Amino acid sequence: VGFKAGVKDYKLTYYTPDYETKDTDILAAFRVTPQPGVPPEEAGAAVAAESSTGTWTTVWTDGLTSLDRYKGRCYHIEPVAGEENQYIAYVAYPLDLFEEGSVTNMFTSIVGNVFGFKALRALRLEDLRIPISYIKTFQGPPHGIQVERDKLNKYGRPLLGCTIKPKLGLSAKNYGRAVYECLRGGLDFTKDDENVNSQPFMRWRDRFCFCAEALYKAQAETGEIKGHYLNATAGTCEEMIKRAVFARELGVPIVMHDYLTGGFTANTTLAHYCRDNGLLLHIHRAMHAVIDRQKNHGMHFRVLAKALRLSGGDHIHAGTVVGKLEGEREITLGFVDLLRDDFIEKDRSRGIYFTQDWVSLPGVLPVASGGIHVWHMPALTEIFGDDSVLQFGGGTLGHPWGNAPGAVANRVALEACVQARNEGRDLAREGNEIIREASKWSPELAAACEVWKEIKFEFPAMDTL
């Protein structure tokens, strides 16, 4: 048997439309935009090849292994409705191509060099189906939704948070004071901003100490368990773990990590530490829009969300939906379900390309944060349900009477919405009315309603799909 050198079309080896996918395969849905003149089958096969065993030419060492066992296969291609020259290419990867328990390795293959490939004008990873056999090699979230509720002793409602602002420039003592005021007023959590690490104006150890003091003082006053997301993100893994260890020594309930800028290796390391030491882990997605904002290139956030659930985190930021388009609402709810639920059916109308079974991997609480205030509370309660964290930064600290009254206003609005929902009222239709009624017996809420009333609150009844 001679070795035949030379370049041959990818589709001869890597396009296999009659392939039956296995339960152990990792399946990927790519949005492919081929260069002019490149047929979609060749483009799809090129993606499968370059993200698995292929290279640009036939190599002598191909004969030393079994390509059929290890190659990625493009097994289906469909045009994207309403787009010219865009296709969804489905690729199946054999499980043996990936290291166990490593999101880093999975992404290095699937979204590695192939994204710079010349035969493609653009490439976007829309969704991944992670097989049960691979999921079982990951620890996943340190604790998950149920354990978190038990630790905090808070049930039957969303949790309330607030990012401390101004995010950069406060001294540690003033920062701690802002934390104390918010928690005393009725919030469950306050949060370090994602870019608060350890800067000259506030070193991490000072911040940790003052925030812990604020936490314990607010806890003693209110009789509720409180938390502050202490950001452990650092320049090295060792420094990150050092910060997490100090947080544990202070006895606080939760730390935080920026998982995309910090990287999946660091994130998984921290998640393991958190499970071993009883710390909850809040995840911020800084940098996600660099990766997921372009419609035709990069990676959809639902893939980053699935990767986080594998790598480990108990909370993750997931957009707010409010004020966005109806379609985006469905898509956001799609990946919110992927974060929280055990089993999610394929549903293309919500952007879910594959049925995903998470077996016993704990769920992640989605965090709604960014530009929300008390008038949004009915919509947020309806959209996200109980298993979520609602974070009002400016919506707390921007209250005309200060942080604590701002926190009171949010807590009153939330409790009113939860009670109304439990009584069977329709939050979508009666939201404004519910908030107005509640503000009659809460001067703090009335003041908040007055400040933000100009910011329109339009929440049509949800389209049921």
UniProtKB/Swiss-Prot annotation:
Keywords: Calvin cycle, Carbon dioxide fixation, Chloroplast, Disulfide bond, Lyase, Magnesium, Metal-binding, Methylation, Monooxygenase, Oxidoreductase, Photorespiration, Photosynthesis, Plastid
Coiled-coil positions: none
Site features described as Transition state stabilizer, chain residue numbers: 324
Domain of life, per lineage: Eukaryota
EC id: 4.1.1.39
Needed co-factor(s): Mg(2+)
Binding site for Mg(2+): 191, 193-194
Localization of this protein: Plastid, Chloroplast
GO CC annotation, single: chloroplast
Matching CDD domains: RuBisCO_large_I
List of residues binding substrate: 113, 163, 167, 285, 317, 369
Residue positions, PTM N6,N6,N6-trimethyllysine: 4
Post-translational modification: The disulfide bond which can form in the large chain dimeric partners within the hexadecamer appears to be associated with oxidative stress and protein turnover.
Modified residues (N6-carboxylysine): 191
Active-site positions on this chain: 165 (proton acceptor), 284 (proton acceptor)
One Gene Ontology biological process: photorespiration
Reactions accelerated catalytically: 2 (2R)-3-phosphoglycerate + 2 H(+) = D-ribulose 1,5-bisphosphate + CO2 + H2O; D-ribulose 1,5-bisphosphate + O2 = 2-phosphoglycolate + (2R)-3-phosphoglycerate + 2 H(+)
Regions crossing the membrane: none
HAMAP family associated with the record: RuBisCO_L_type1
Description of how the protein assembles with itself and partners: Heterohexadecamer of 8 large chains and 8 small chains; disulfide-linked. The disulfide link is formed within the large subunit homodimers.
Family: Belongs to the RuBisCO large chain family. Type I subfamily.
Additional observations: The basic functional RuBisCO is composed of a large chain homodimer in a 'head-to-tail' conformation. In form I RuBisCO this homodimer is arranged in a barrel-like tetramer with the small subunits forming a tetrameric 'cap' on each end of the 'barrel'.
Function noted in UniProt: RuBisCO catalyzes two reactions: the carboxylation of D-ribulose 1,5-bisphosphate, the primary event in carbon dioxide fixation, as well as the oxidative fragmentation of the pentose substrate in the photorespiration process. Both reactions occur simultaneously and in competition at the same active site.
Protein known as: Ribulose bisphosphate carboxylase large chain
